[in-house]
Amino acid sequence: MANAREILDRMKSIQDTMKITNAMYMISSSKLKKAKASLDETEPYFYSMQMAIGRILRHVPDMKSEFFNQRPEIKPEDRKVGYIVVTADKGLAGSYNHNIFKDVEECLKSNSHAKLFVVGEMGRHYFEKKGLEIAHQFHYTAQNPSVSRARNITEKILEEYLNKELDEVVIIYTKMLNGVQTETETRHLLPLEKEHFKI
């Protein structure tokens, strides 16, 4: 049976753990609010751009661009698909990273010509441990996105697409539904499809 000293030590240990947990909760809440604010600022811009492209396509329906070229001459099994995978930089994120890894592995099963472009430390560690080749590593933290980082990623992907090193580009990331709910989103980026733009 534990003596009084051992019981006091355990109580102190539990109290210390509670303090650490509360501190982690406060930090997480602050980061979540910041991320939500960034999302609220960015989403209107994204949808405005989508609608603007839709209006252009309405007035120039026969516009030719390599970005709209579906490359029908390439068989589905021969298409080279680039997957941009966005993961977290740290663990302790519940199913956040796990769900992304699961979706990526499902995609890789159906495509033998896949290339991985990974953003985030957890993704890099996971795929390296699995022995999967990462085509190009973007050494950026996922939690601090910026326009210049997005531009660097875009330039690399577009270069490979225009050089026909890639036939399709897909992004896999976590979409925030509300303050507590998220889901893994798989979005087809290239080639563009006119019907996907709001007109």
Question: Which role fits each region the language model picked out?
Answer:
Residues A2-I199:
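Conserved loop-to-helix interface motifs that mediate assembly, gating, or partner/ligand docking
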